[in-house]
């Protein structure tokens, strides 16, 4: 369970460039929740994920994960508990390392290891089985460097690396935005698969309203650092893009000015 309580964050506070990114955000995710997050540019979506991951400190408020207060926990320690996939496919994998080496690093995350770092044959067998689930033929390319993979292949590999240790929370920060529509659909399908099979709790930020409606069991909309809509269950299933646009306009007094929100 993830609990955010009255989270506030202002960048450049006390200056003429002050920007309120999160304005008293409170949010609870129950175990197994897959929540999609929608909102215009500057709404606070990615800032919220960065706050949860520990990239940014909060100005005030608390963050709890499985009843543990992690508000002051450094980002590198939270990485043992939280899996994350970024927008840029180049971010999540090491370009100069083999596929099996990337997987080995992910598998050892949060574990103590000495000088004996060699990958065992047993591990290679396990990695091949994991890679088969991607259906990209990567199980036969363990010694291929990450930099030789396509953007979609690298993002799929990153997704596997982020979920292979069954994190308490998975953060997906516009992880298909840099991909072509077909590849994005494949990565989203893999996301659904890993979240469902691993019974993971997940937060997925997206600009694409159709994707926000189609995936997850719950949807929240943000504007000006606040949550202005929170729907789940049958209410979410009945949502349409037009209804979301209307809700945004009523709550914010502005049009949702982002063409990517309407992409198929």
Question: Which residues are covered by each model-predicted region?
Answer:
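A short, flexible loop at the N-terminus of ABC-type nucleotide-binding domains that lies
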Residues: 1, 10-24, 74
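A short, proline-enriched helix->beta-strand linker immediately N-terminal to the Walker B motif
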Residues: 164-168
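H-loop/switch region of ABC-family ATPase nucleotide-binding domains
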Residues: 206-207
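Conserved beta-strand-loop-alpha-helix hinge in the C-terminal portion
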Residues: 226-250
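Helix-to-loop junction immediately C-terminal to a conserved catalytic motif
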Residues: 53
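ABC ATPase NBD coupling module
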Residues: 15, 69-83, 91, 113-116, ...
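Conserved ABC transporter NBD signature motif
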Residues: 61-69, 229-231
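The feature captures the beta-strand-to-loop junction immediately N-terminal to the Walker
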Residues: 38-40
